[in-house]
Amino acid sequence: MRIRPILALMTAASLIFAACGGTTSQAPSTAPSQAASSEPSSAPSTAPSTAPEAATVRLQLQWVPQAQFAGYFAAQAEGYYADENLTVELLDGGPTIIPQQVGSAPDGPEFTISWVPKVLEARETGGSDLVDIAQMFARSGTLSVMWADSGLTGPCDLAGKKVGVWDFGNEFEVTAGLGKCGYSPGLENNGDPTSQYQKVIQAFDMVAFLNRDIDAAEAMIYNEYAQVLEATNPTTGNLYQPEDLTVINWNSQRVAMLQDAIFARASWLAEGNNRDVAVRFVRASIRGWIYCRDNPGECVNTVLAAGTALGAGHQTWQMNEINALIWPNQYGIGILDPVFWQQTVRVSKGAGIITTNPPSAAYDQSIVQEATAGLADQNLKGDGFVKGTVTPTPGGE
């Protein structure tokens, strides 16, 4: 794949992103003032003036090494964690690893990457004390894709159809979106084809969709959607094109929910100087994401060196899409959007993921605020960010 520059000096359209506050409401209330340079920096250089106390920590990733986590790999490779006197072990995820469960264990990793609704569910039903300390993704990357020649045009066309989803909490946006149409799963149990659909647990790939075994497939814009575009259309002999597909972007359906965030256990944060360790970890990680925004090609190489299973072309696509989920953010990277938080809670309650509003203890913006205060000379908002254009390659090679 080829990627064009993704940062230009132009005025970015304003997006509504605000910070956290409040006590027991379902949303933070005010947005802190964040200083941000309008000029990008190719290598964020801010580091502590004196060496802080050394610490060794672990970060549980949601999946295997890929550009979804490029900022953390970059923070390690570029020495940003070392600048904070941190030794960081990046723990691979996978189909059998549930990060919010691993991270909730008393002896679990100090930091965890997970989606907000999964953690809210774990807090309510599993006694987790995970806290969102840095909301890295400002937008959801979840799609559902259908074949354009099927005549299906949107979620309310899926009654009586086979709808692929992933489990372990990855399905929440899809099932919530279909719920807005008045549809529920259960068609496979002699259900009503006018108000129910067959919920098919999809493998973490697009094989069933490409074989037309399901009518709609869940896909991340940075991963499985690209896998379809990297596959050969047997009719034409060429790669599938976007016009071959009908795409439901759950952001536009107002059921998207907050995704990748850095979580830490409240009990761990309360011990010793662990909160300071968290500030340093978040600061170094943000430097890694700034580096990947400004140097996407270098970050792709870093991810490939980490042992990713998919090729350079696929990781280039993914890096481009991941950057677009993070940047721009009106109030700065890592700051929680109160409107999106409210939507996440509303959709989670409506879908039965949680039954009550989460307490204010579910998030703590003070850590990311302190971390970014030490990066005031950086372009924390991504002002001028422009998403690049990437051309899919066969098999993502």
What does each model-identified segment do?
Residues 185-197, 237-245, 275-276, 307-323, ...:
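Short, surface-exposed acidic
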Residues 342-397:
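Conserved C-terminal helix/tail region of periplasmic/extracytoplasmic solute-binding proteins
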Residues 33-60:
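N-terminal low-complexity, Pro/Thr/Ser-rich intrinsically disordered segments
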Residues 117, 150, 204-208, 212-308:
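Pocket-lining segment of extracytoplasmic ligand-binding domains
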Residues 51-203, 211, 215-222, 242, ...:
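Short, glycine-/small- and polar/acidic-enriched structural segments
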Residues 1-18:
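Sec-dependent bacterial lipoprotein signal peptides
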Residues 272-355:
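Secondary-structure end/capping motifs
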Residues 17, 21-30:
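Bacterial lipoprotein signal-peptidase II cleavage site
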